[in-house]
Structure formats: structure tokens, C-alpha cells
């Protein structure tokens, strides 16, 4: 299955994406990862105000197939979480790159974004998987 990964996104090896929005960053799970999980039944996210460290677990996503950890693609503070996805996890499945976003983070270092994969590199990675 072919996936369309937006050019303005950057991706972590663990399949989380970031989209910079001025001084904030929106974080979500890539369409590829969501597809691999199957039917999503539960999402656990950190609280607003929590500090995240790049590469450490910030929550879980549970599907009928598995429970997977999600990892912070960058370091920062949680400014907002998507309450709609918490209440209705199918939203993540329906539109992972849009309304199915997970968190908004105020990054400690915007430069960390550039260390993530661009959409072309990520697309090649998942195509080879």
C-alpha cells in the first residue's frame, strides 16, 4: 500500500511525525504506523504541562493486534493534547496526518526537528519495510 506523507512533516524512526507551526510543533503517528496497527481501541497521552525528552516513551496506542509505545520525536513541554482522539481513538485511524494528531509541544530546541527524516526519506524507509 502506498502512503502520501506531507512534505512539511518530519518523521522519527519510531514513526511519529512532527509539523512545525510557528514556535510550536504538532506531533502525531504516521499513516504507515496506524495502518500497521489495525483497529485502534485506546490511546494514552501525557498531561498538558508534562515535559517530554526526545526518544523516551510518552504514551501508548492499543489496537486489536498490539499495544505499542509512542516515543517523543523531540524534547519539549506538552501544550495541548487531542482530547477528541482520547475520547474516540478511531479519529487517529481516520485521519492520522490531520484531525488525528496527538500532541502540541513547545520544543526546547527547534533544531531537533532538522535531525528527523524528511517525507521522501521516510517514504523510502517504509517502502523497504
From Swiss-Prot:
Binds 1 lipoyl cofactor covalently. Residues 24-106 form the Lipoyl-binding domain. Its cofactor is (R)-lipoate. The modification N6-lipoyllysine is found at residue 65. The keyword Transmembrane helix does not apply. GO terms for biological process: glycine decarboxylation via glycine cleavage system. Pfam families: GCV_H. Keywords: Lipoyl. GO terms for cellular component: cytosol; glycine cleavage complex. It comes from the Bacteria. The glycine cleavage system is composed of four proteins: P, T, L and H. The glycine cleavage system catalyzes the degradation of glycine. The H protein shuttles the methylamine group of glycine from the P protein to the T protein. Belongs to the GcvH family. NCBIfam families: gcvH, PRK01202.1. This is Glycine cleavage system H protein. It comes from Synechococcus sp. (strain CC9311).
Amino acid at each position: 500500500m502506498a502512503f502520501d506523507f506531507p512534505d512539511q512533516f518530519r518523521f522519527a524512526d519510531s514513526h511519529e511525525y512532527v509539523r512545525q507551526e510557528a514556535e510550536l510543533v504538532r506531533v502525531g503517528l504516521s499513516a504507515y504506523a496506524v495502518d500497521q496497527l489495525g483497529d485502534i481501541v485506546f490511546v494514552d497521552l501525557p498531561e498538558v504541562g508534562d515535559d517530554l525528552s526526545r526518544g523516551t516513551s510518552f504514551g501508548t496506542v492499543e489496537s486489536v493486534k498490539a499495544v505499542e509505545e509512542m516515543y517523543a520525536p523531540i524534547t519539549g513541554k506538552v501544550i495541548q493534547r487531542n482530547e477528541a482522539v482520547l475520547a474516540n481513538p478511531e479519529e487517529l485511524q481516520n485521519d492520522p496526518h490531520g484531525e488525528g494528531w496527538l500532541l502540541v509541544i513547545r520544543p526546547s530546541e527547534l533544531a531537533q526537528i532538522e535531525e528527523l527524516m524528511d517525507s521522501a526519506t521516510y517514504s523510502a524507509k517504509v517502502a523497504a519495510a
